[in-house]
Amino acid sequence: SAASDVYKRQGVYRAEYPYLYRKPAGMTEDEALIYYTKSIDKIFEEASPAEYVAAIILEPLQGEGGFIPAPVEWVKSLRKVCDEHGILLVADEVQSGFGRTGKLFASEYWKEAGCEPDMIATAKSIAGGVPLSAVISRTEVMDAVPGGVIGGTYGGNALACAAGLKVLEVIERDHLLERSNEIGRICMEKFNQWKDVYEVVGDVRGLGAMIGIEFVKDKKTKEPAAEFVSLLIKECADHGLLIESAGTYGNVIRFLAPLVITDAQLNAGFDIMEKAIQRLSKL
């Protein structure tokens, strides 16, 4: 896909994302955050000088990478780097936007910490299943693009925009941001219980209702348990629960339930998944 191949394009460079569960050996979290910030400087030194960099783009909570939240202190460092060099800080909220993390946008957590992004890219949940995407930015950034330069046949599609407006209405009317946080609280409590009980559950992390469970063969070595996750997906499907994997090693189950899910549905899913973990742990 274009999304997965974008880093291969000329002029696009990848820096390390803070994966604190798998931070470099021997480092404290504070030392690791410094290390990850310096990986940006390494790009400037080895690939492209800072004055030629237009933007730094990151997900507030990494999606395909394994549902890894960006540490706010690290984002503060990025904001400082961007301000020093005139670089735009762009939040890719295609997965994390529209209530998934307990706020309309996950980057609102950044804003509260004083490191607001310059631009937000969003799609997916924006229109409740109707194809729609959007770019949000400050007036001076949007006005810098000449009229007619960016557009497309279906830009401003009336049906999609109407769906997007209705989504915003429903989020506010049904208090879905509050519900997202409640779902997150329930799930984090349950998943952390599993972490305490099952050797195979290595890490639980997330924001709001967007949570990743990382499975390992051993909690000390943190060796990824990708095969276990593959079996878990099949075992759950056989019992009526659809789950999906993610992560660099394919060993993370990503939890991204609809914000309209009921507690009864949540508990039914928990029951199916925990019993599957129990059965597979005995193999």
Regions found by a protein language model. Give the residues of each.
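Conserved N-terminal phosphate-binding loop of PLP-dependent enzymes in the Aspartate aminotransferase
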Residues: 1-283
